[in-house]
Amino acid sequence: MLLERVRTGTQKSSDMCGYTGSPEIPQCAGCNQHIVDRFILKVLDRHWHSKCLKCNDCQIQLAEKCFSRGDSVYCKDDFFKRFGTKCAACQQGIPPTQVVRRAQEFVYHLHCFACIVCKRQLATGDEFYLMEDSRLVCKADYETAKQREAESTAKRPRTTITAKQLETLKNAYNNSPKPARHVREQLSSETGLDMRVVQVWFQNRRAKEKRLKKDAGRQRWGQYFRNMKRSRGNSKSDKDSIQEEGPDSDAEVSFTDEPSMSEMNHSNGIYNSLNDSSPVLGRQAGSNGPFSLEHGGIPTQDQYHNLRSNSPYGIPQSPASLQSMPGHQSLLSNLAFPDTGLGIIGQGGQGVAPTMRVIGVNGPSSDLSTGSSGGYPDFPVSPASWLDEVDHTQF
């Protein structure tokens, strides 16, 4: 603001000071004394002696311009130093006429914008790192310090424990894995190691024991599960091998689910013998039977036992399939039943078996009708199932 100089003895000065002829003498705002000088300085409606209007910081007399904050007045430089923008490095105010440097939101003097390590002033285009406390580090010094820190961390000093010291610590650990403070102090005095070294050694030892126990339990259970997996794998491979062998044997037999007549010969007790001298009902030995054999005739007992699982000839699955055999001759007409409790009654002429009945003494009876080739609803599909319906208790 501009200072206003007023003369006290003229009407003009009275008008400038705002007086209307009042005999009241103004009082100085600096020394609180009445102003009887020829000239009076006026700042914000306050009157000053010429010698009392000074800068609050540098005490220089203010003649033309001054800056006020509260009850204090300042010169231009001191006002901006105190209340203006401050440098982030030196924390001093920056006058508005000076050239500054900026880094993000921080403002620096030109001479303060320098590396804190090498003290080199940074110019436009230089690369630098801005630290958290607003300090500046040039790129070369930053990378050097970082590399030095990494090397010091990698080459930290290691404590060497002798064999005697180690033996003492092991004995103490066997007595108490977690010793009290006075025990650690005693061990420190005995071994000559630092208290911190003794404490860290016990901590590492306890962690190692815990890790070894955990690893041992994991290995035990791992071996157990591996054995279980191996045993399951072996059993599964056995089942797979059985299943793989099954289709090979099934491919060689026409009817796989039914027992062969040779097996029924001795197990069921119904067909006890089969020979050439057995009585034949309704046919001769020279005629073609149910089996289309190359030499012709009825199969003998030795030939019949050769009908095994690897034979291309199979046993008919149901009585309905007998109608499709050559000559439509019943298979049961070629078999002899020496047991007295079971008989076969055939009706019809030679080579023709229109109807037959299997009669058991005390067992159930069923009719076989050859009137059609569509099948027999009274009997199930398997010959073993309907042959087993005969009561075996009487035999």
From Swiss-Prot:
Residue ranges occupied by any LIM zinc-binding domain in the UniProt entry: 28-78, 87-141
SUPFAM superfamilies in alphabetical order: Glucocorticoid receptor-like (DNA-binding domain) (SSF57716), Homeodomain-like (SSF46689)
Ranges of compositional bias, category Polar residues: 257-278
Compartment(s) where it occurs, according to its Swiss-Prot or TrEMBL record: Nucleus
BP term (GO), one: regulation of transcription by RNA polymerase II
Residues covered by region (Disordered): 208-304, 363-383
Subunit description: Interacts with ldb1 and with the N-terminus of rnf12.
Protein name: LIM/homeobox protein Lhx3
UniProt organism field: Xenopus laevis
